[in-house]
């Protein structure tokens, strides 16, 4: 819980990254935290109240070495809640970033995000979309274009159709998945669920081979759904 311990806050500040890339024009900017403060945290509201202050500390630390780049601030609860933010003027090169994977692909579904964007008069960037049907994604991309919200997809590569390229599961991969999801409250349960070591090693090596681009399947429908060719 990065916003609850001062020492962790200090360690988390990405000063070394900013120092390394401060003169690199290909870098859009730095996102301080990815999806901070999960909705299942027992002290969620308390942490929400501290988030903006932690962001201010992070921005100030970066500005010690880099005054060039934009800094992206993600909302609380999967980058979706922007109510904790009260001060959008503490730096002149910040923008906000949101994520969305489900719900209706309509403007009404993201109206609160649009309203926040308009109220602070700063850009809103949809940093992650994906994990849905091609039809949903095409409709949602259209909604974002109509509302002047830039977006990127996630991920580029995975084991189903909701990505640019798909990985074909290797032989015995189902056994690896079963082991990862099996009960493991005791060592007995772990031993009983564990697949043979030789088979597991071969499945993992085959997975690495399957991940190579030359062995992946290009998902044409997914690419079209993003408005790309």
Predicted regions and their residues:
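Extended, alpha-helix-rich binding/interface surfaces that flank or overlap catalytic cores
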Residues: 143, 147-229
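General structural signal for secondary-structure boundaries
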Residues: 9-12, 133, 215, 219-220
């Amino acid at each position: 819980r990065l916003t609850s311990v001062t020492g962790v806050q200090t360690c988390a500040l990405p000063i070394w990254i900013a120092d390394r890339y401060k003169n690199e024009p290909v870098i859009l900017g730095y996102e301080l935290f990815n999806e901070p403060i999960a909705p299942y945290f027992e002290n969620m509201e308390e942490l929400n109240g501290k988030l903006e202050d932690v962001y201010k500390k992070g921005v100030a630390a970066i500005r010690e070495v880099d005054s060039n780049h934009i800094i992206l601030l993600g909302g609380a609860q999967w980058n979706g809640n922007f109510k904790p933010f009260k001060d959008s003027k503490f730096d002149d090169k910040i923008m906000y970033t949101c994520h969305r994977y489900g719900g209706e692909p309509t403007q009404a579904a993201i109206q609160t995000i649009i309203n926040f964007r308009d109220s602070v008069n700063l850009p809103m960037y949809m940093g992650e979309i994906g994990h849905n049907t091609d039809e949903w994604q095409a409709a949602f991309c259209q909604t974002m274009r109509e509302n002047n919200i830039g977006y990127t997809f996630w991920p580029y590569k995975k084991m189903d159709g909701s990505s640019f390229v798909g990985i074909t599961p290797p032989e015995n991969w189902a056994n690896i998945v079963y082991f990862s999801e099996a009960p493991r409250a005791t060592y007995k349960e772990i031993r009983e669920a564990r697949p043979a070591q030789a088979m597991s090693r071969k499945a993992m090596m085959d997975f690495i081979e399957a991940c190579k681009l030359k062995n992946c399947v290009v998902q044409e429908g997914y690419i079209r759904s993003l408005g790309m060719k």
